[in-house]
Amino acid sequence: MKPIEERYLETLAELFPTIARTSTEIINLSSILNLPKGTEHFITDIHGEYEAFSHVLKNGSGAVRKKIREVFGRTLSEEDISELATLVYYPREKMELVRQEKDEEQMDNWYRVMLYRLIAVCRYSSSKYTRSKIRKALPKDFAYVIEELITEREDIEDKEGYYEAIVDSIVRIGRAEPFIAALSELIPRLVVDHLHILGDIYDRGDGADDIMDRLMSHHSLDIQWGNHDVVWMGAAAGSEVCIANVVRVCARYGNLGTLEDGYGINLLPLATFAIRTYGEDLCSCFRLKGQKQETEDTALNMKIHKAISVIQFKLEGQIARRRPEFGLEGRALLHRIDFVKGTVGLDGKEYALLDTNFPTVDRDDPYRLSEEEQQVMGRLKSAFLGCGRLQEHMLFLLNRGALYKVANGNLLYHGCVPLKEDGSFEEVLVYGRIFRGKALYDRLETFVRRAFFSTNPRHREEGRDILWWIWCGKQSPLFGKDKMATFERYFLAEKETHTEKRNPYYDLLDEPEVAERILREFGLQGEHCHIVNGHVPVKKGQSPIRCGGKVLVIDGGFSRAYQGTTGIAGYTLTFNSTGLRLVAHRPFTSTEDAISTGADIHSERVMAEDYTRRLTVGDTDIGESLRERIQELSELLEAYRNGTIAEKK
């Protein structure tokens, strides 16, 4: 048998069968190494807030407006820059608004002006890419014309006349609007080369399904799963306890529309059961979070909220007892209730319950679902497993996502790396074996994927159960607290019972040796390596910059519920050829305001790490892959020249 290296070169020779083809590819790849590094955009904790997320995606955390300023900063007024930026963000809506204010001749002139401006921004933004990469980004309908307009043509003497003729033709034949829309959608793609989503796409907002659709159409991205994403993944895999958690969170925030309208999940059996079981119950402990005034559906939603919460507590008790290694016996609380006194025993103390109406709880077997509850969960499970759109979204999360990512010297994850008080890695038991640090992440991810893809029923069940543990487990890297005090927050008035103690990780992030230890664990070390961390909102007075800039906490703060705590809408990060930029955003008002007034999200740069020289593709992970490819092609070239492999002309 031939050595594997020789077999590999023979396979490579099928793609590059001649010396000329091989040499050309080496030259092409070598030239790419010297191009400027593309811009990376880091967003986290979207929490289902589609409008705000969509706007940040369109404006690249200010990167698009920055490009416009670089092109026109000395020639356009601030008003004109805002108009052009709005056109890039919302081309169709902006053109419809302008059309209402201008006659046909004025509109044609406006089209011409905007076309020239958009072409200039496209040309400037595309300067760091190869023609091949630009062609792949171009919209098919206008690919040839756009390439002509944004590419310098040295063979044409009257360039201005050439471009003017193209623009006039576009306007004359009535194709200005779709062409402007195509250019506007191209610009953000050219400005931001790659997108990183650091978790929690799902949660309380009502647009998570639309966010997933948007991400699925994105040209280049990766996802680090958040705790809210993982519980949805568990639900889609058929975990009943995860399904109950998902439905409860949606009910708690008045967001059942994501389930019913977004995914077509039939909640009628649950609603019918809730009305029949809790019809006379005011369910006052189950008021909706963030609801400013009651609607005609409020009473029903509160009953649904209570019904699914009780089911959740039962299912969690079942799994806590079935999986004692998870260490979640403390979440099984129903058997600790004294139904006569209306109290619950917790940590050696007795607390009065705020709600004592539990008609479906069997005093002798409190974690057993009633027959009706079993039927409700059976219907919900079938709906989650049978929802094509949900399964498609979860498959995308699995294919493009992971628990962490190492990218261009940065370690990206949601939550925390579980640590002991002394800063060493916490030892975590996962199905009979101890894991810590990177090995813990890798092992957990294996079980997550088994929940969906394993053909072994036991492995699939282990995967489904571990998804719930990742959602709320004490040592879970995505949860990072000693308990999820859901029961206590509903039923107990005493605030001390609501406390969820955070993992020591969060208090140790300013220790250089801790940050360096985490980075080394994931294969990173050096001056320009960072931890980029999502999950925890940065409160007023706190800094997102930890450990002298080694750790960047970039909770996007899209959730309106947290904006009163943070005082802003959150942080995002960009990383381009000149360095890193941490940007703080003010809350987004609405898409309507952005279109009608040109209002953008007000962003303020709070940190810049500038490099002494401009980074190139050669300085990135892609550059490392390209150098490996060049080395392989060079070996093939040598094999052709020394006669080891024959050319196939």
Regions found by a protein language model. Give the residues of each.
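Feature recognizes metal-dependent phosphohydrolase scaffolds
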Residues: M1-K649
